[in-house]
Each structure stands twice: as C-alpha cells, then as structure tokens.
Amino acid sequence: MRVLFSILGVLTLLSIVPLARSFLENQDCSKHRHCRMKCKANEYAVRYCEDWTICCRVKKKESKKKKMW
C-alpha cells in the first residue's frame, strides 16, 4: 500500500511541476512592477527580467498606529 501511495505521489508531483514552471516563466513585469538595474528606496526586488535587470515592485505603505493609552 505504501508503494502504491509513493508511486501516486511521484506521479502527482511530476504532473504539477511542469505546469508551475511554465506558469512562472511566462510572467513579465506588470504595470505595478518596473525593470531596472537598481530598485528605488520605496521598492523591493521581485525577480530578474529577460535582460538581467531587476523587476522592482513598490512597497506597501505602513500605516502609523496610534497608541490608545
């Protein structure tokens, strides 16, 4: 029974991995991301673009919390 589950697990992984890889490869920088050589102070690096520049995304602004007491 363990062998059967192991074989089914391996087959499941082999079928999922190519789908995930092709999904991630096709993603380019969207309108919220920019390809640059260096990210600005208000951005962080997400991935590399096709020409080896860095895909930068704007950081979310942190809300200032007021102390209640």
Swiss-Prot record:
Per UniProt, the keywords (alphabetical) are: Antibiotic, Antimicrobial, Defensin, Disulfide bond, Secreted, Signal
Q: Which family does it belong to?
A: Belongs to the beta-defensin family.
- Domain of life, per UniProt, equals Eukaryota
Q: Where in the cell is it found?
A: Secreted
What the protein does comes down to: Has bactericidal activity.
Q: Name one Pfam family in it.
A: Defensin_beta_2
Quote a single Gene Ontology cellular component term: extracellular region
**The name this protein goes by in its record:** Beta-defensin 43
The residues the entry assigns to the signal sequence are 1-22
Cysteine-cysteine disulfides: C29-C56, C35-C49
- Organism in which the protein naturally occurs: Mus musculus
The processes (GO biological process) annotated in the record are: defense response to bacterium; innate immune response
